[in-house]
Structure formats: C-alpha cells, structure tokens
C-alpha cells in the first residue's frame, strides 16, 4: 500500500476495471499508426466458431413479434356507430355471411338492424350498416355478394337511419 505524506492514495486512485480487482494491467499507448491489423493475443491458430446467440427474454418487442407472426387468415376492420363514444375491431373472416355479421354487430352495440330489401334498404330500424370499400365509396352492407364485401371492406359504420339516405 502506497502512502504519501500520510495520505492513502491507493484507495482514491481512479483506474479502469472492476472494483476490487487487484491486478494491474500495463497498457501500451502509442501514437504510431501501422498498416497491420490488431493482433489478438487470445486467438489461436484454429478459430473457434462464435457462441450461439441466445434470445433475450422479452425481445423482440411484442408489437413487431405480432406483426411477424400475424395470422394471414384474419381481416380486421374498424366498426363505428353513430352516437357510440368508441370504435371496435372485428375479424370479417370469422363470419360466413351477412346475417352472422349483423347478429354480431347487434350484440356488440346493443341495437337492431331490421329487415333488408334490395329496393328499400333496411326497414324497421333506426340504424343502417354501411361500409367503406377500397375505392373510398360508402355502400350499404348487403349490396354486393359476401365474398366481394369481405375482400373490399375497409371500415364499417352503423349510421343513424335518418342520415344514411342522404349520405349514400
């Protein structure tokens, strides 16, 4: 232990390394550049393969993991209802036809749709289900065959019956 003028300088000395390490390493510092690559004293003639990477728990983030592992058989669309303060998402691939979809929407938002006729639209209800297709046009749910609807639907909106005829 080095003591100078009664001071213990060894304890307050700043050095690189882990705390409590007693080994002192001599570092070579030079300002001379060489064209040679650094020499690795630890390497042997035979280079060992790098160790296998282990996956850290919680990595990758859940969001990107969900995107990568996303099931390709789903088709989520946003559903809004006039007067409801929130939006929902539903998977159109879960339903096989319009009656199943409308029943699910009725249960989700607690309303009734009524009967659909091609000439008059939806009768007997204060609400009309509409959807936005890939072209950005708003159409009545049930106007096109189910397969075409499920592939082109971008958003669903349950409009008040009084607003639907003027908007479409």
Curated annotation (Swiss-Prot):
Post-translational modification as stated in the protein's UniProt record: Phosphorylated by phytochrome A in vitro.
Signal peptide residue numbers: none
Tissue: Preferentially expressed in stems, leaves and flowers.
Keyword Cell wall biogenesis/degradation in record: no
One family name in Pfam for this protein: AUX_IAA
GO CC terms: nucleus
Induction (UniProt): By auxin.
Motif (EAR-like (transcriptional repression)): 14-18
Region feature (Disordered): 1-74
Keyword Nucleus in record: yes
Gene3D superfamilies: Phosphatidylinositol 3-kinase Catalytic Subunit, Chain A, domain 1 (3.10.20.90)
Keywords, comma-separated and alphabetical: Auxin signaling pathway, Nucleus, Phosphoprotein, Repressor, Transcription, Transcription regulation
Database matches in InterPro entries: AUX/IAA_dom, AUX_IAA, PB1-like
Biological processes per GO annotation: auxin-activated signaling pathway; response to auxin
Segments of skewed composition (Polar residues): 23-34
Compartments (UniProt record): Nucleus
GO MF, one example: DNA-binding transcription factor activity
Ranges for domain PB1: 74-161
Functional description taken from the UniProt entry: Aux/IAA proteins are short-lived transcriptional factors that function as repressors of early auxin response genes at low auxin concentrations. Repression is thought to result from the interaction with auxin response factors (ARFs), proteins that bind to the auxin-responsive promoter element (AuxRE). Formation of heterodimers with ARF proteins may alter their ability to modulate early auxin response genes expression.
Subunit structure: Homodimers and heterodimers. Interacts with the auxin-responsive protein IAA2. Interacts with TPL.
Similarity comment text for this entry: Belongs to the Aux/IAA family.
UniProt remark on domains: The N-terminal half of the protein contains two conserved domains I and II. Domain I includes a slightly degenerated ERF-associated amphiphilic repression (EAR) motif which seems to be involved in the activity of transcriptional repression. Domain II is required for the correct degradation of the protein through the SCF-mediated ubiquitin-proteasome pathway. Interactions between Aux/IAA proteins and auxin response factors (ARFs) occur through their C-terminal dimerization domains III and IV.
Protein name per UniProt: Auxin-responsive protein IAA1
């Amino acid at each position: 232990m080095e003591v100078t003028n009664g001071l213990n300088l060894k304890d307050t000395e700043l050095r690189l390394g882990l705390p409590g390490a007693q080994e002192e390493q001599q570092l070579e510092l030079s300002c001379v550049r060489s064209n040679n690559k650094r020499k690795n004293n630890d390497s042997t003639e035979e280079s060992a393969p790098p160790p296998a990477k282990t996956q850290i728990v919680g990595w990758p983030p859940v969001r990107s993991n969900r995107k990568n592992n996303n099931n390709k058989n789903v088709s989520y669309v946003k559903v809004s209802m006039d007067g409801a303060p929130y939006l929902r998402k539903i998977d159109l691939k879960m339903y096989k036809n319009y009656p199943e979809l409308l029943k699910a929407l009725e249960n989700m938002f607690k309303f009734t749709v009524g009967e659909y006729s091609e000439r008059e639209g939806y009768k007997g209800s204060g609400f009309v289900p509409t959807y936005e297709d890939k072209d950005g046009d708003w159409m009545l749910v049930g106007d096109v065959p189910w397969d075409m609807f499920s592939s082109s639907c971008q958003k669903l909106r349950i409009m008040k019956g009084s607003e639907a005829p003027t908007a479409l």
